[in-house]
């Protein structure tokens, strides 16, 4: 799914982002004609349904061979916060696009729950923007299964908004793993992985300090989601996820951050994918914590201290022998100029793995 604008503003960057969106369509056509993109096309508040459907950009998207089409020929179509426009508005868009030769199947992306029944009359699929903090249940699939043909489930790593000094705490990798687990257990039809590459919400962009760790984790859970079978772990991998400072760190400038109603979670996590049992260790300054882990996936968390500057160290041992070890690429600071609560992440692999024919 890629964002576009039906009527991009001439000065606020929407045209610039649109160039990249169309470049993705062109790349998909050139590199893999079987790879299709679901266009999510924004509208301004005052744009009429007819002007939206007749937009030069909408027509370009509709004519592109990389745009996702259903077996019945309809073009899959979406927009973030679909409910910001009325059902009647969307009916007129659908009628106009059909008259223009491009019937669409609307996949609603919702930020709320109260209009789902109304939109069930016109939506081929439904997905929610989702939760950004882990919980016990997110009944999206159960709620929307009777209302639509396809149910999409949201997948996100974290939500850190520098522009408002506001963050929802994902508790290291917990939100990402929890959302994937629920999508699998609830048998969602689609998974919507929100990368947010406009750098405004820091969800999963690989050029940030989280690196490619979320993509490694997503690759594992995508296979599980698509096949219905948990993938076998055939090599040891350690992933560390932590913030660069405590939420209550001494800051020299700026205002404090708002962590929402759940509050901050100050922990260092070592997430292990193990082929067999082992001992996990986390070293913080002069103190070492350890946990016995079984084969499979183990999350090991320890408190992130508030007034200590250090570089976290991580290791996996078996029978007293170090299998994998390494330091975080990101030091933890005891004071900062401006705080940055976005999580950092990295991967550690056994040093001798390549000699074993990996």
Label every model-predicted segment.
Residues 1-269, 275-358:
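Glycan-processing catalytic domains of CAZymes
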